[in-house]
Swiss-Prot record:
The keyword Phosphoprotein does not apply. Pfam families: PSI_PsaJ (PF01701). It is a single-pass membrane protein. It is found in: Plastid, Chloroplast thylakoid membrane. GO terms for cellular component: chloroplast thylakoid membrane; photosystem I. This is Photosystem I reaction center subunit IX. Belongs to the PsaJ family. Gene3D superfamilies: Single helix bin. One of its GO terms (biological process) is photosynthesis. Keywords: Chloroplast, Membrane, Photosynthesis, Photosystem I, Plastid, Thylakoid, Transmembrane, Transmembrane helix. PANTHER family: PHOTOSYSTEM I REACTION CENTER SUBUNIT IX, PTHR36082. InterPro entries: PSI_PsaJ, PSI_PsaJ_sf. The lineage of its organism: Eukaryota, Viridiplantae, Streptophyta, Embryophyta, Tracheophyta. The gene is psaJ. May help in the organization of the PsaE and PsaF subunits.
Length: 50
């Protein structure tokens, strides 16, 4: 069991998990908001000028 914990805590495994999560997140955002260059919601009105 100690060997499995050591393997799962190595940098390449953690990097692959992080990249896979981010890729899945980007895919899901593009599924719900297709062709959006920026993610804009109506509640983000503090970015616009008055």
């Amino acid at each position: 069991m100690q060997d499995l914990k050591t393997y799962l805590s190595t940098a390449p495994v953690l990097a692959i998990l992080c990249c896979s999560f981010l890729a899945g997140l980007v895919i899901e955002i593009n599924r719900f908001f297709p062709d959006a260059l920026t993610l804009t919601f109506p509640s983000f009105e503090f970015f616009s000028s008055p």
